[in-house]
From Swiss-Prot:
This is Fatty acid oxidation complex subunit alpha. The record marks 119, 139 as: Important for catalytic activity. One of its GO terms (biological process) is fatty acid beta-oxidation. InterPro entries: 3-OHacyl-CoA_DH_CS, 3-OHacyl-CoA_DH_NAD-bd, 3HC_DH_C, 6-PGluconate_DH-like_C_sf, ClpP/crotonase-like_dom_sf, Enoyl-CoA_hyd/isom_CS, Enoyl-CoA_hydra/iso, FA_oxidation_alpha_subunit. Substrate binds at residues 296, 500, 660. Pathway: Lipid metabolism; fatty acid beta-oxidation. The active site is at 450 (for 3-hydroxyacyl-coa dehydrogenase activity). It catalyses: a (3S)-3-hydroxyacyl-CoA + NAD(+) = a 3-oxoacyl-CoA + NADH + H(+); a (3S)-3-hydroxyacyl-CoA = a (2E)-enoyl-CoA + H2O; a 4-saturated-(3S)-3-hydroxyacyl-CoA = a (3E)-enoyl-CoA + H2O; (3S)-3-hydroxybutanoyl-CoA = (3R)-3-hydroxybutanoyl-CoA. It comes from the Bacteria. Signal peptide: none annotated. PANTHER family: TRIFUNCTIONAL ENZYME SUBUNIT ALPHA, TRIFUNCTIONAL ENZYME SUBUNIT ALPHA, MITOCHONDRIAL. Residues 311-729 are annotated as: 3-hydroxyacyl-CoA dehydrogenase.
């Protein structure tokens, strides 16, 4: 053994060939600050070996390196910029030393080589992969860009076009695609990976492969003439702005950095990369996006803990077909849980089966399933007009019309037919679970399971705990949601639960703004373009359905009359009274026609302004700041109340529910991250200016206390101040 640390080992293989093996504690290798320092120490030993002829780099685990340790990111980002800069220079010196070894080097890639793992293999002369390998630089998805030379080496290895695509999108590539673009030199069966890597390395040692020629382009300027460069980078910048927009600066920064570095060799190009990385790392967007990644890990860990030792059901059932029931049945069948789909109406069953078939057809078109697989999945959905076989289902999801009497009757009816251990769940969006539980003899076996539309696309499932819901019931439903590929978040019962409870104050703020003379077109534009919502409030209401929103609004007003009751007609009332129900009947705040693919196309409708004139002040222009404040303050206050009342268990779960359930702009990170970025004292001061508008704008006491004590919702990560001093001996 030449060198051994907690994260990697260096030893001789044969005849002057050394092997560097990444083998950190735990299930995966990460390129954390400790591993980077250990790599430097290993190279320090290696550089002293006069008999060294070649180096093979591999992993002892099922993946090479999954990336940096993202749990360290916020601490790194909180370091003073000059400290972070020093550490990046230190880290890049190590990768340069790997690249500059006076012998050929090769990486054997099994599983993932992402982020820093990809940058590590780029520093070797050759790369060989097994078929399941995936290679990529996902940093831009986290609001940053490659920082260990990825933006320098990848374009010089592949050419600018392929490299820009990988870096700007953050998508990884398969082993076969990597071979096509020149990212790897060969793809071999897993059992032959190390042997083939060794063979290739020996060929390089014997002069049969020119390892110096393989290395040279990575040290030199990018080979592009001025015309090619102008075209390549102009097109890339245009695409990035179109896809990422102004709220996500990392992809454009990466493209501009690669462009600026194109005319330089490695040293100057790496300096430019570091100079671009540091400001991105200090940005609010990076903190928010890294926060989402960490929150996602936390939420998934909570689900795993809640359902520990509980298997997903072998058979499920959905009561109520149609689009929603069909969507739930499809998702269940797709993820290998057979499902009974029961309805009292043959047409609804047809609609449900057609929805499942349509979604499977899309999978077929994309090559995700073949015809045989599609048929076998569809065969695991059993449509029925009666309850035959329902007693065999372990979890039953009620998804009938959003009417408390109908839901209660259906739940009581099915409970009489099933065993004492069968779990019942209601896919209700607003009706309190405890209200529905009154119709049941075994309320401990009952909870809410709120799916979001469209089911196949929306990652969140709200699991609602009633007063009598047992832990066993929660565990079964969380296990089922997880098996379905969803992110379950457990919330406590109240009208609207969490997501809809906080959505309707936002929509109420919109309604008041229109009442006071706000133009809904301008409001939508500001909330989409400036704040970053995927849809403005008027457009969202059209998509949800004005009739659905009108009904839910009444439920919320009854549940929280002091804040959500209103003594005036608003824009939703006007649309509802005029039977403008949104996309479902082609007219709401906007008019809808179908495009060539049959998708709804939004158009302005002059009639709407005339209709709204009866309930609103004369049109006036509000500032962007006013529009954002008047719509967002009610939502933010309600989100905070939900945490203070224990409806949600943590800021992390609240923020993920908003991002996954409502499409809250990820670059803000969720309401709690947004508040921390804004500063609670600044928020309270801003909200105070709108307090005259009513109870929705009154800041909760807990948030006022946080503002007084200068507290945040997320712990502030201590800066890693000493990372740049971890120099090899």
């Amino acid at each position: 053994m030449l060198y051994q640390s907690e994260t990697l080992q260096l030893h001789w293989l044969e005849n002057g060939i050394a092997e560097l093996v990444f083998d950190a504690p735990g299930s995966v290798n990460k390129l954390d600050t400790k591993t980077v320092a250990n790599l430097g120490e290993a190279l320090n030993v290696l550089e002293k070996q006069s008999e060294l002829k070649g180096l093979l780099l591999r992993s002892a685990k099922t993946a090479l390196i999954v990336g940096a340790d993202i749990t360290e990111f916020l601490s790194l980002f909180n370091a003073p910029p000059e400290k972070l800069h020093q550490w990046l220079v230190f880290a890049n010196t190590i990768f340069n030393r790997l690249e500059d070894l006076p012998v050929p080097t090769i990486s054997a890639i099994n599983g993932y080589a992402l982020g820093g793992g990809c940058e590590c293999i780029l520093a070797t002369d050759f790369r060989i992969a097994s078929p399941e390998a995936r290679i990529g630089l996902p940093e831009t998805k986290l609001g940053i860009m490659p920082g260990f030379g990825g933006s320098v080496r990848l374009p010089r290895l592949l050419g600018a076009d392929s490299a820009l695509e990988i870096i700007a999108t953050g998508k990884d590539v398969t082993a076969n695609d990597a071979l096509k673009i020149g990212l790897v030199d060969a793809v071999v069966d897993p059992e032959k990976l190390v042997g083939s890597a060794l063979t290739m390395l020996k060929q390089a040692i014997d002069g049969k492969l020119d390892w110096q020629a393989a290395r040279r382009p990575k040290l030199e300027p990018l080979k592009l003439n001025p015309t090619e460069a102008a075209m390549c980078f102009t097109i890339a910048k245009g695409r990035v702005m179109q896809v990422a927009g102004k709220h996500y600066p990392a992809p454009l920064t990466a493209v501009k950095t690669i462009e600026a570095a194109a005319k330089f060799g490695r040293t100057e190009a790496l300096n430019l990369e570091t100079n671009s990385f540091v400001p991105l790392a200090g940005s609010n967007e990076a903190r928010a996006l890294v926060g989402i990644f960490l929150n996602d890990q936390y939420v998934k860990a909570q689900a795993k803990k809640l359902s520990k030792g509980v298997a997903a059901p072998k058979l499920a059932a959905v009561l109520g077909a149609g689009i929603m029931g069909g969507g739930i049945a499809y998702q269940s069948a797709l993820k290998s849980v057979p499902v009974i789909m029961k309805d009292i109406n043959e047409n609804s069953l047809d609609l449900g089966m057609n929805e499942a078939a349509k979604l499977l057809n899309k999978q077929l078109e994309r090559g995700k399933v073949d015809g045989l697989k599609m048929a076998s999945i569809l065969a695991t959905i059993r449509p029925t007009l009666d309850y035959a076989g329902i007693e065999r289902a372990q979890v039953i999801v009620e998804a009938v019309v959003e009417n408390p009497k109908v839901k209660a009757a259906v739940l009581a009816e099915v409970e009489a037919l099933i065993g004492e251990d069968t779990v019942l769940a209601s896919n209700t969006s607003t009706i309190p679970i405890d209200q529905l539980a009154k119709s049941l003899k075994r309320p401990e076996n009952f909870c809410g399971m709120h799916f979001f539309n469209p089911v196949h696309r929306m990652p969140l499932v709200e699991i609602i705990r009633g007063a009598k819901t047992s832990d066993k019931t929660l565990a079964a439903v969380v296990a089922y949601a997880t098996q379905m590929g969803k992110t379950p978040i457990v919330v406590n019962d109240c009208p609207g639960f969490f997501v809809n409870r906080v959505l309707f104050p936002y929509l109420a703020g919109f309604g008041m703004l229109v009442r006071d003379g706000g133009d809904f077109h301008q409001i939508d534009k500001v909330m989409e373009k400036q704040f970053g919502w995927p849809m403005g409030p008027a457009y969202l209401l059209d998509v949800v359905g004005i009739d659905t929103a009108h009904h839910a609004q009444a439920v919320m007003a009854a549940g929280f009359p002091e804040r959500m009751n209103k003594d005036y007609r608003d824009a939703v009332d006007v649309m509802f009274d005029n039977q403008r129900f949104g996309q479902k009947n082609g007219q709401g705040f906007y008019r809808y026609t179908q495009d060539a693919k049959g998708k709804p196309r939004k158009e302005n409708d002059e009639q709407v302004d005339k209709l709204l004139a009866e309930i609103s002040q004369p049109l006036q222009e509000f500032s962007d700041e006013d529009i954002i404040a008047r719509t967002m303050i009610p939502m933010i206050n309600e989100v905070v109340r939900c945490l203070e009342e224990g409806i949600i268990a943590s800021a992390a779960e609240g923020d993920m529910a908003l991002v996954y359930g409502l499409g809250f702009p990820p670059f803000h990170g969720g309401v709690f991250r947004y508040l921390d970025t804004l500063g609670s004292a600044n928020y309270v001061e801003m909200a105070q200016r709108y307090a005259h508008l009513g109870a929705l704008y009154h800041v909760p006491a807990g948030l006022r206390a946080k503002a007084e004590h200068n507290e945040s919702y997320y712990p502030v990560s201590a800066a890693l101040l000493d990372v740049s001093t971890n120099q090899p001996a």
